[in-house]
């Protein structure tokens, strides 16, 4: 059967730290990276909590609420118009440099690629089109379809149902260890994209099938 790749979007294909330059213009270089990282962490925390509580809201709501929290926590440095500009920037984040070439090679090898995200299909489409990556994907599978978030086991089953793939032939490609562990627990093969030397994998005793430092290494490791 065909090998199917499910690509996480935020943090794997698309650089969520692409807001740092704009934050620097508002807060200065010293505070921008801290703010961006805290915003991202809080965004994911809100998605986890909403998933567990079964109090679903669009991922964009998690993003907006996390921005408000982070601004309050770190000293109310951003005005309301600046926050709106950041949210607009979040809808057009850049792709990582390795994404386009890696996806092109995988397509040429006949490997089916899907985008698989907490974000809505509309939001992911906008991101991928802006980054010129949309043509490499057969489809977008959004967790919004079932009103939950990764790593709920139901979202991994939803992907299999929508892609008509089987666990043993499906790979999750993600830089997020919680996502890798979730997919591994669901019976998938997994490729953890370790984008920095400092990145740590959760010590749960559930390890990725492979670890790569760049998407360019997938073509030689995925079978």
List each language-model region with its residue ranges:
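Alpha-helical elements of Rossmann-like donor-binding domains used by nucleotide-donor carbohydrate transfer enzymes
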Residues: 21-22, 38, 65-69, 85, ...
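Asp-based, Mg2+/Mn2+-dependent phosphohydrolase catalytic module
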Residues: 1-5, 104, 120-121, 125-223
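A metal-dependent, Asp-based hydrolase signature
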Residues: 47-84
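Active-site neighborhood of HAD-like aspartate-dependent phosphohydrolases
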Residues: 1-41
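Short helix-capping segments at alpha-helix termini
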Residues: 27-32, 73-78, 108, 132-136, ...
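Short, well-structured alpha-helical segments
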Residues: 32-40, 79-88
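Substrate-recognition element of Asp-dependent hydrolases with the DxDx(T/V) motif
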Residues: 81-94, 99-130, 137-143
């Amino acid at each position: 059967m065909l090998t199917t790749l499910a690509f996480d979007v935020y943090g794997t294909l698309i650089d969520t730290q692409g807001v740092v330059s704009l934050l620097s213009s508002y807060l200065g270089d010293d505070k921008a990276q801290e703010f961006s990282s805290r915003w991202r962490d809080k965004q994911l925390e809100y998605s986890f909590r909403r998933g567990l509580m079964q109090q679903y809201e669009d991922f964009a709501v998690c993003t907006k609420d996390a921005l408000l929290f982070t601004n309050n926590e770190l000293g109310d440095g951003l005005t309301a118009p600046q926050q709106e500009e950041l949210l607009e920037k979040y809808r057009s984040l850049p792709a990582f440099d390795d994404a386009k070439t890696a996806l092109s090679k995988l397509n040429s090898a006949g490997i089916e690629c899907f985008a698989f995200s907490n974000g809505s299909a509309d939001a992911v489409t906008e991101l991928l089109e802006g980054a010129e990556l949309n043509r490499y994907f057969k489809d977008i599978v959004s967790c919004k379809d079932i009103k939950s978030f990764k790593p709920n086991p139901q979202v991994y089953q939803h992907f299999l149902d929508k892609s008509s793939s089987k666990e043993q032939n499906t790979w999750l490609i993600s830089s997020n260890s919680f996502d890798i562990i979730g997919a591994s627990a669901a019976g998938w093969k997994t490729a953890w994209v370790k984008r920095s030397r400092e990145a740590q994998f959760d010590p749960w005793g559930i390890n990725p099938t492979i670890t790569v430092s760049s998407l360019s290494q997938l073509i030689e490791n995925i079978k």
